[in-house]
Structure formats: C-alpha cells, structure tokens
Amino acid sequence: MREFVGHGIGKEMHEDPQVPNYGKRGYGPLMKRGLCIAIEPMITLGDRQVIMERDGWTVRTRDRKCAAHFEHTVAVGAGEADILSSFKFIEEVLGDKAI
C-alpha cells in the first residue's frame, strides 16, 4: 500500500514532509526537532495494490484481503519522540473488549 504515506501535520492537516511506510533507514526525510508528523503504518494480508472506491474515501486491496491502518501523531524531540495522539479513551470505553 505505497500510495499512502504519513505526513507532516501543523496548521494544515497534511503538510510536508511525506513519510513513506517503506524504504531504507537513513534515506527518508530528515526528522528535525520540533517537527510534528502523522505516522500511518498500513499492513495487508495480500496484494499491496489498492483500489479507490467511487465515494472517494473508501480504499480496499485489489484482492480484497484484510488490511489495517493505524495512526499516531508524534513530535520529534531531542531524544525520543513525544506521542501526541492517544487511544486511551478507546481502552476506557471498551474495557476488556479492547484489542
């Protein structure tokens, strides 16, 4: 699923840099202190080719196998990144049913 990438986030929802979910370490955009990015890993059990549905929003894999998308927003710091997004509320609502 290489058509979709993580991205910078700030005044606008989607900003540079684009952050691919694939590649070689050390070859992507430079992550500078203060940069906020949305990291959006995607996995599929089958083909990485995708089809965009007519509604302009829904995406599925060409072979219709299961796929998943997850997102975290992080701020690049001097050491470790700070995770700005939290899914704690999902765990609180779902309790034992949370994955």
Pin down the residues of each PLM region.
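Charged, cofactor-coupling segments
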Residues: 23-99
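Short, basic/aromatic beta-hairpin or loop at an interaction surface
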Residues: 4-19
